[in-house]
Amino acid sequence: MPAESAKRFKPSKYVPVSAAAIFLVGATTLFFAFTCPGLSLSVSPAVPVYNAVVFLFVLANFSMATFMDPGVFPRAEEDEDKEDDFRAPLYKTVEIKGIQVRMKWCATCRFYRPPRCSHCSVCDNCVEEFDHHCPWVNNCIGRRNYRYFFLFLLSLTAHITGVFGFGLLYVLYHMEELSGVRTAVTMAVMCVAGLFFIPVAGLTGFHVVLVARGRTTNEQVTGKFRGGVNPFTNGCCNNVSRVLCSSPAPRYLGRPKKEKTIVIRPPFLRPEVSDGQITVKIMDNGIQGELRRTKSKGSLEVTESQSADAEPPPPPKPDLSRYTGLRTHLSLATNEESSLLGKDSPPTPTMYKYRPGYSSSSASAAMPHSSSAKLSRGDSLKEPPSIAESSRQPSYRSEPSLEPESFRSPTLGKGFPFDPLSSGSRSSSLKSAQGTGFELGPLQSIRSEGTTSTSYKSLANQTRNGSLSYDSLLTPSDSPDFESVQAGPEPEPPLGYTSPFLSARLAQQREAERHPRLAPGGPAPREPSPVRYDNLSRHIVASLQEREKLLRQSPPPGREEEPGLGDSGVQCTPGSGHAPRTSSSSDDSKRSPLGKTPLARPVAPRFGKPDGLRGRGLASPEPGLPAPYLGRSVSYSSQKAPPGVPETEEVALQPLLTPKDEVQLKTAYSKSNGQPKSIGSAPPGPGQPPLSSPTRGGVKKVSGVGGTTYEISV
């Protein structure tokens, strides 16, 4: 048997109460059996009735005092105990009716005992208004059962008095029968009643005094208010009425608890991210937009865990089983997908690492750099009100510009500085692999990129992939939807604007228009790339413009420019189907001597003009002579020509150009960005001389602002 159960069922605890019950019930039974019948005949029949009523009252109060809860306080639970430190003071003082009363800390129940409360060592509980522990009733006497205990004492005293008195009366009436059984039993009951009368009567008198004074047995024995004022007394009559007539005190143990279920969602808990659609509302540069994108929980956690210094992971391959709606779109770009997915895409810049890659449609939003650059160009077909407004209102995905509007450069696209020299070789290798995928239909005639509606917005749409990749910068408009727009009427280009970027498809179309069809065995002439002056200051550009005006005022009487060669906004990319592009720094070109052959150190011009506009430098071949065959370029693969054009074997034509020739090429395209007139918007008329035709093979030095000297071949 457990120790707690053994302690609860100790026989010694029940000996006093059992003896009291036996003596009470036994003596009364003998009284009613042997004494009451003679008294009812000799004295009055009311005697047994009176004794029966008193006895029942005694039994009722005895039962209530024994089995009733005295007012036990429940023990504090562990979580409540944590609020009070073990180093807390042993006593706390409260004021009751202007008198300081101490409350002692109960180490067993773990709370400060209220006033007049004490811990019972027998019951091991704190009892409200603890009086004493009575072994005769085997219970503590407290606030809730003190009334019944007090009435039990009063009724028991009266009952003992009645039993003893009515027994003595019976003996007096039957003096002749003292040897009889009835008289002998009556005398025995009288002895028992007399024995219990003295202590019970004394205890009853003591509690009568306590009730009249408003004290408890514990307070009286311990001398709590000895020599002082009792703050709990309300007068004799009020104290008696409070004990006998007040409403019963509430019970603290075993109260039915109504459990209420309350769902609490603290603000610091984030909701679970499901694999559904997440609506993202962003606000950048004053433009608001709501985008929907399917993004899994795992991808969000990876993005949040990455630091700003860590390198971004390579873009994932598209999951065709999950994005079933993309299969039809992916069939249009099978060739470039197969060539690009096998290679590592260029790393994403750090400032765009945490930008989610959104696109114009929800279906193609989860594609990596290459596929999303080809499948999500629908927004690029929407024409802005004007180029000037589009330059003042950058794309809502672009990085916000911190420059005031009055100090911004007139050139467009400066929000993303891009150096075509350092990244030319890498982007060229990627674009040449994609070249065959671009030829989906007959090439249309396009005069300038500024004449289409995709001038600036198409470039800004490339940043929706979340990064400025090489493909998105070099191919701003290579979607199938873009081709359908090209067949329509071409509006006049706005003045002072030429896009610094041109797609590989546009370059292919312009190359097909510029050059006549070559023989199958003939080498393909090289088309240089246009010049970007985004990084030059305004003063340098102004000096170059003045030199350009001088060149236009003195056109040569010799070669006339063909109608299709007046476009200066052409950027010859490796995917254009002609000469491959290999970039080299300006320092390398300056260090290379003229005596080195192209085979020993091939130096390709980074910028240039069409063949009709290119001046004859020291190392440039004659127009009529075929270019020397220098071997196939290692970085690029051959591709098919447009329909109707015989296939030509692509060779690397890399003539030597001195730094002077480079300056000449830069001068020819000095007005490509932000100038009053665009020299590449339309071909010149039949009577108009070419804009930048060279006059002679000499070189002139022009001094610019800041002491900079430019060598321009004229």
UniProtKB/Swiss-Prot annotation:
Modified residues (Phosphothreonine): 294, 303, 348, 350, 411, 436, 658
Highest rank taxon of the organism: Eukaryota
Reactions the enzyme catalyzes: L-cysteinyl-[protein] + hexadecanoyl-CoA = S-hexadecanoyl-L-cysteinyl-[protein] + CoA
Cytoplasmic-side positions: 1-13, 74-148, 213-714
Active site: 134
Written domain comment of the UniProt record: The DHHC domain is required for palmitoyltransferase activity.
Name under which the protein is recorded: Palmitoyltransferase ZDHHC5
Organism: Bos taurus
Phylogenetic placement of the source organism: Eukaryota, Metazoa, Chordata, Craniata, Vertebrata
